[in-house]
Amino acid sequence: MNLAGSGDGFITLADGSMRWGRYGAAGVLVRHVGDDGTWYFLARRSLHCHRGGTWAIPGGALDLGEEPIDGALREFGEEIGSQLDQFELGETHQDDHGGWSYWTVIIDVPQRFDPPATLGWETAEARWVADHELGQLELFDAFSSTLTRLGLL
């Protein structure tokens, strides 16, 4: 069962912190490994979003019954405005906050693609970033923590 939009909303965790996504959240880290190195497709959050102006991955609330990979791909479509057609599923990482989790789904694409000319309202800009440039960007704090845990920063 998947009720579209059913996961939208904040929840309060036992420690008093708030998280977006009543059933957790997920995002997709798109990776391309080529002769010129490893690249990641990132999105700069629009000023209409929490911590606007920072870089992260497309992602958001999971709907009731939605698997992390499905939610991550759906959010990519909503925020970037295009679908990922050719990819290989890589690792999936769960960041458990005690009753609420954020899932980072890593997928590999055979080639870098151009971002669409029109992006979703939550995204100010999207582009490919070389792995050695990740630490030079102003990253969304939780995304920075994830990259550190994954050994990418």
PLM region descriptions:
Residues 2-56:
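N-terminal strand-loop-strand
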Residues 60-153:
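Unchanged
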